[in-house]
Amino acid sequence: MNPEPVVLINAFEVPDGQEEEFLAAWERARAFLATQPGYLSTRLHRSLSPTADFRFVNVAVWQSPQAFQAATSQPEFAAAPVPFPFHASLYQVVHQDQR
């Protein structure tokens, strides 16, 4: 039996005026990670509040913690970091509701 996928939630601190720089760096990282084994999906969210501490929040789904760790340990990923402070962790879904 395969374990449930894990969810990466990554909140980014992006100063005013640096949104385009952030988006370009995030897209480079996303393009690489999307080619890695175990990658399932990602969604980037932008805050509606201009005063939010975290202007962007990425929610990605990976097949396993090991797949995520392997992908982010690749030299290609380390060579092109997203140059903004971030707060990331892997999560398990404990409840889901949908209409």
What are these regions (language model features)?
Residues 5-13, 43-73:
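Short, well-ordered beta-strand segments in beta-rich or mixed alpha/beta enzyme
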Residues 22, 30, 66-68, 95:
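Short, isolated positions within intrinsically disordered regulatory regions of eukaryotic proteins
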Residues 32, 58-59, 64, 82-87:
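Juxtamembrane helix-loop transition sites at the ends of transmembrane segments
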